[in-house]
Amino acid sequence: MLVPNEERTLLAALALWRVGFEQFHGYKLASQLRTMHTTTRAMSYSTLYRCLDRLSERGLVHEVPPNPTSQTRGPKRREFMLTTEGETKAVDLAKAAGEDSELFWNLA
């Protein structure tokens, strides 16, 4: 069973995947969470990455190995992608919540 923050994170990952973002990093996911959940308190990056780690342990997301040539400055970005199981779980969550409106799939 997922906790609410894990559900929100998984739903945001699904929304990104549906518009073509097969891989995503924390900043993009946090931006999507803010777009989708304007009435709830923003999730901190540390909470977001803990959720991603737990979702990864459950096989719902997969951390993509870093590409050493893709980023030359700053801290290394951790990239993730939905697994097939994660996609299925997120779609089930969205249906259960009645999240079939255009607002749910809206991107910033």
Regions found by a protein language model. Name each.
Residues R58-G74:
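Beta-hairpin "wing" of winged helix-turn-helix
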Residues H25-T39:
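DNA-recognition alpha helix
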Residues R77:
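Short coil/loop residues immediately preceding or within conserved phosphate-binding loops
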